[in-house]
């Protein structure tokens, strides 16, 4: 079974995808760099978790 992500991660990721969908890709490293530019995220761990969820969602949307 997979891991369950917190609501904060899901909500933030979905808002960012709606705003900046054309900037995100299916590559985790690229999404991490985009997040650094686009959003004000306090910790590296939170940034990585949001980037991972965005990557997951972008793969589903293709």
From Swiss-Prot:
Q: Name one GO cellular component term.
A: cytosol
**Keywords of the record:** Ribonucleoprotein, Ribosomal protein
Gene that this sequence comes from: rps17e
Among the record's GO biological process terms, what is one? translation
The yes or no answer to whether the keyword Ribonucleoprotein is present is yes
The text of the family note is: Belongs to the eukaryotic ribosomal protein eS17 family.
InterPro entries cross-referenced by the UniProt entry = Ribosomal_eS17, Ribosomal_eS17_CS, Ribosomal_eS17_sf
One Pfam family from the record = Ribosomal_S17e
GO MF terms held by the record:
structural constituent of ribosome
State if Flavoprotein is listed as a keyword. no
| Source organism, top-level taxon | Archaea
What is the name listed in the Swiss-Prot or TrEMBL entry for this protein? Small ribosomal subunit protein eS17
PANTHER family given for it?
A: 40S RIBOSOMAL PROTEIN S17
């Amino acid at each position: 079974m997979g891991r369950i992500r917190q609501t904060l991660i899901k909500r933030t990721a979905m808002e960012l995808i709606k705003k900046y969908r054309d900037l995100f890709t299916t590559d985790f490293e690229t999404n991490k760099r985009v997040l650094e530019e686009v959003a004000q995220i306090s910790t590296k761990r939170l940034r990585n978790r949001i980037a991972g969820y965005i990557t997951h969602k972008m793969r589903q949307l293709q």
